[in-house]
């Protein structure tokens, strides 16, 4: 990481560019370059890789990604104040850092990639992290334009992402995430590592897209999961009443006991119910 050593410390960068964290942008800057390097290494070998980073801020993780060999980093930053700091990094790594100043929620990175698969590696702004993740998990067609995500979330959100049936954090997000990806919490980061320190512990999560998830319509899966977890303490025969079909019949046809509750149903059970929901709609059309 010799090239990084030539760049100013991140605290100096923040001071020089007056990058006080803005709560409205969900900013908490990670200044420890050992931790940013650990996050970057969690994405596996970076040599010749294309990496999409959301919310680079002063560029700590950006520097680690480039120093570890990423061929092309696309840094998407909404805060115009951070652009000069990122441009200084780009000068150290000519032709390897592409800076896009825009809102990640409306940004389509695919035209920047062509046929290249990317990795998404980011300390996500907390206020839009779940929104972004759901968008990436909803990508069509599948497999998606990325082959791995290494992302930082609040610990509570990370637990929801990796949760399985019969775990307290299990819900709609866990169903979608684990249907389409293999998920794992890699490590935690203390609030004291950030400026300003958040009130909660953060966790780094790795999501690897499944090549062939169990087949079902994504929208039907989301609809079934939303209904079931909307009244998670009730039996499926009650909680699924908002669906346009008989809930007990739907569950039974999917091989799921309609007296069970959402929190006890594995992802495969939700997939089976989503398929039955799609089938019932098709039957009604004929």
Curated annotation (Swiss-Prot):
UniProt subcellular location: Cytoplasm
The residues the entry assigns to the signal sequence are none
What would be one Gene Ontology cellular-component term for the protein?
cytosol
Instruction: List residues binding S-adenosyl-L-methionine.
Output: 28, 30, 55, 77, 103, 123
| Keyword ATP-binding in annotation | no
What EC number(s) is this enzyme filed under? 2.1.1.182
Keyword match Methyltransferase: yes
Provide the reaction this enzyme catalyses: adenosine(1518)/adenosine(1519) in 16S rRNA + 4 S-adenosyl-L-methionine = N(6)-dimethyladenosine(1518)/N(6)-dimethyladenosine(1519) in 16S rRNA + 4 S-adenosyl-L-homocysteine + 4 H(+)
The superkingdom listed in its UniProt entry is Bacteria
Which key words tag this protein in UniProt? Cytoplasm, Methyltransferase, RNA-binding, rRNA processing, S-adenosyl-L-methionine, Transferase
Q: Record's SMART domains? A: rADc
InterPro entries given in the database record? KsgA/Erm, rRNA_Ade_diMease-like_C, rRNA_Ade_Mease_Trfase_CS, rRNA_Ade_methylase_Trfase_N, rRNA_adenine_dimethylase, SAM-dependent_MTases_sf
- Which GO-annotated molecular functions does the record name? 16S rRNA (adenine(1518)-N(6)/adenine(1519)-N(6))-dimethyltransferase activity; RNA binding
Q: Which HAMAP family match?
A: 16SrRNA_methyltr_A
Q: What does this protein do?
A: Specifically dimethylates two adjacent adenosines (A1518 and A1519) in the loop of a conserved hairpin near the 3'-end of 16S rRNA in the 30S particle. May play a critical role in biogenesis of 30S subunits.
The entry sums up its family as follows: Belongs to the class I-like SAM-binding methyltransferase superfamily. rRNA adenine N(6)-methyltransferase family. RsmA subfamily.
Its name, as the record gives it, is Ribosomal RNA small subunit methyltransferase A
